[in-house]
């Protein structure tokens, strides 16, 4: 699968790295908050259920996502693969922006410019 993704991105020579900080140590707590918030709940909805979880995890996951972004060369891109809602929490922690729940195969484009971040959608075709 990684070979296919690298070929599709035309980045066969770019190394694949693992950022362990993007893995939550409290996955079960995320599942509980998601279930309590209801089907299709956003990170914002889960925050109403477990404010400490979302605030602390967003900070941790956002910091890990910042490490990925900071390691990129100018014009570089990274593909971060993981589970919802922790990806959404990482985006919140990095950018301060709440995004809606992402389905399988969905993602966002985060652009860093002069120390600030913008979040855009990625078209799925």
Model region roles, listed by residue range:
Residues 59, 63, 84-89:
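A structural signal for well-ordered alpha-helical segments within the folded catalytic domains
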């Amino acid at each position: 699968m990684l070979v296919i993704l690298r070929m599709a991105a035309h980045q066969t020579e770019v190394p694949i790295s693992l950022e362990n900080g993007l893995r939550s140590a409290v996955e079960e707590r995320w599942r509980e908050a998601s279930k309590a918030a209801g089907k299709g709940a956003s990170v914002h909805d889960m925050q109403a259920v477990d404010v400490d979880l979302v605030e602390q995890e967003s900070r941790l996951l956002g910091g890990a996502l910042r490490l990925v972004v900071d390691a990129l060369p100018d014009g570089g891109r990274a593909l971060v693969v993981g589970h919802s809602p922790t990806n959404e929490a990482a985006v919140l922690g990095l950018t301060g922006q709440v995004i809606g729940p992402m389905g399988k195969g969905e993602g966002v484009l985060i652009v860093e410019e002069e120390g600030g971040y913008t979040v855009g959608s990625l078209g799925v075709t």
